[in-house]
Amino acid sequence: MDTFIQQIINGLVLGSVYALVALGYTMVYGIINLINFAHGEVLMVGALTSWTVVTALAPFGLPGWALLLLGLIAAVIVCSALNFAIEKIAYRPLRNAPRLAPLITAMGMSLLLQTLAMIIWKPNYKSFPILLPGEPHMIGGAVINNVQILILVMTVVTLSSLMYLVNRTKLGRAMRATAENPRVAALMGVRPDTVISATFVIGAALAALAGVMYAANYGSVQHTMGFLPGLKAFTAAVFGGIGNLAGAMVGGVLLGVIESLGAGYIGDLTGGVLGSHYQDVFAFVVLILVLTLRPQGLLGERVADRA
């Protein structure tokens, strides 16, 4: 039972990261029908930016929470500026192009960001400092540390704030109007280009937060670290129903729990033939099953393709 509780905790923490990144995928797709495959690399840039700030300021004797906060602020600023530039330079000129063109561009942008990060930060793994030390907390026989608690709290606060922004603010109404019909929204005074740029910036901020939390929890950063979390977050978005904010949240958390439980019990289920290092397989098994059985996702609705 203790193992089960521990895996649930680990899954909720991992799923929180997936949910934050999945929201970026689903927001962009909901407005311009683009799968931004460079989104995982934005997470990576956020983590590496935070690492740079934290290691640069650590010798000044700042407390761990202050270093983490400053690293997070720097990551959000850099990632927001980066995603704003990507949207304006790489995606906006292709907005009316065949759908394959921006998809290929997104893949190319992903490789470009990985290469630039490798040049700037070098290809070796870097240790992310332990910024919130302290005795772990016991829940039954399971353990949760300060960073994991922070991830869960930050995720709940962030997701609640995002839902409020989308449903209760002027920007949120403009985003929903643009997603429904950008031409009609423009006639009603909405500026679609501004709304789309704002969506990319918000998605980047979420990815930056996820990147910093991911690095703080797992303790290392590297230029390829965003690929798998980004791919799994895309799986989570599809799992929950891409284009649906609640679906991205639910899909991310469920995928994290499924992956964690799979890693914890796969050895017992296969008689030791397979180990926990096969945990990545579960995310893609889920993707295949969802695309086969319910392609619109758990909370998505089957709709006609827009012209």
Task: Please identify what each model-predicted range represents.
Residues 4-54, 85-101, 237-245:
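Single transmembrane alpha-helix segments in multi-pass membrane proteins
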Residues 143-222, 240, 245-251:
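Helix-loop-helix "hairpin" substructures at the membrane interface of multi-pass membrane proteins
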